[in-house]
Amino acid sequence: IYTYVIGRG
């Protein structure tokens, strides 16, 4: 999963 908050997938 990729989120703009975490910036990781």
Swiss-Prot record:
GO terms for molecular function: polygalacturonase activity. GO terms for cellular component: extracellular region. It comes from the Eukaryota. Its EC number is 3.2.1.15. It is found in: Secreted. It catalyses: (1,4-alpha-D-galacturonosyl)n+m + H2O = (1,4-alpha-D-galacturonosyl)n + (1,4-alpha-D-galacturonosyl)m. Induction: Inhibited by citrus PGIP. Its main location: secreted. GO terms for biological process: cell wall organization. On the 2D-gel the determined pI of this protein is: 9.4, its MW is: 44.5 kDa. This is Endo-polygalacturonase. It comes from Diaprepes abbreviatus (Citrus root weevil).
